[in-house]
Amino acid sequence: LETVIVDNIKCNNKNCIIICNKKNCIVFNCIFNYKIS
């Protein structure tokens, strides 16, 4: 299993979660989510 890093950040004054592994990062917020390669 790959290591998963979860970080809480601020996006537009709202809480966001970034979930990263060795291949990509996924950013979640209250309105939408998108993948960062």
Curated annotation (Swiss-Prot):
GO cellular component: host cell plasma membrane; membrane; viral envelope; virion membrane
Job of this protein: Envelope phosphoglycoprotein which mediates the fusion of viral and host endosomal membranes leading to virus entry into the host cell.
Protein name (record): Major envelope glycoprotein
Membrane topology qualifier: Single-pass membrane protein
Subcellular location, record wording: Virion membrane; Host cell membrane
GO biological process per UniProt: fusion of virus membrane with host endosome membrane; symbiont entry into host cell
Lineage, uppermost ranks: Viruses, Viruses incertae sedis, Naldaviricetes, Lefavirales, Baculoviridae
Source species of the chain: Bombyx mori nuclear polyhedrosis virus (BmNPV)
Similarity comment: family membership: Belongs to the baculoviridae gp64 family.
Assigned keywords, A-Z: Fusion of virus membrane with host endosomal membrane, Fusion of virus membrane with host membrane, Glycoprotein, Host cell membrane, Host membrane, Lipoprotein, Membrane, Palmitate, Phosphoprotein, Transmembrane, Transmembrane helix, Viral envelope protein, Viral penetration into host cytoplasm, Virion, Virus entry into host cell
PTM section of the record: Palmitoylated.
